[in-house]
């Protein structure tokens, strides 16, 4: 096989994996999606997401780290110049994991999008933090958040 043929097969496999995950995504939580993160496509600001199912995942690089978002409202991204999942939370929901080994850097919730549920984790200031309560909008380690976050210390 030539390099071009191998590359074509790899692209075909990647597309098939992404479509398979997208078909199952509505039934998966953030932990399950992030476990299959390698199958999630990068957000494309020129793409028409209006035919995608609610819950379909994309990733975006936020502050140098990959963050996973799921579609809330199907739309054509090209109609919203400059929009990304991280700055259009009415259209995309930030996902989190309960797996400390796959914890993502803390990102501030916007409205209800991105709030941390019970046992979801994030990294912050070199530590892994676990949310003690659902609907957690607070920054880990901030004054007065002891009832909301546990420093796992990993």
Where does each model-flagged region fall?
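Tryptophan-rich substrate-binding surfaces of secreted polymer-degrading and adhesive proteins
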Residues: 2-154
């Amino acid at each position: 096989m030539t390099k071009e043929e191998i590359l074509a097969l790899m692209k075909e496999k990647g597309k098939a994996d992404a479509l398979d995950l997208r078909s199952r995504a509505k039934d998966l939580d953030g932990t399950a999606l992030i476990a299959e993160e390698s199958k999630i496509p990068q957000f494309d600001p020129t793409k028409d997401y209006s035919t995608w199912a609610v819950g379909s995942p994309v990733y975006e690089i936020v502050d140098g780290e990959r963050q996973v978002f799921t579609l809330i409202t199907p739309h054509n991204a090209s109609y919203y110049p400059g929009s990304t999942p991280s700055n259009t939370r009415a259209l995309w929901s930030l996902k989190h994991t309960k797996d400390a080994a796959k914890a993502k850097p803390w990102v501030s919730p916007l409205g209800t999008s991105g709030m941390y549920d019970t046992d979801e984790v994030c990294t912050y200031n070199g530590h892994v933090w676990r949310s003690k309560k659902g609907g957690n909008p607070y920054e880990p380690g901030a004054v007065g958040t002891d009832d909301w976050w546990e420093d796992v210390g990993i």
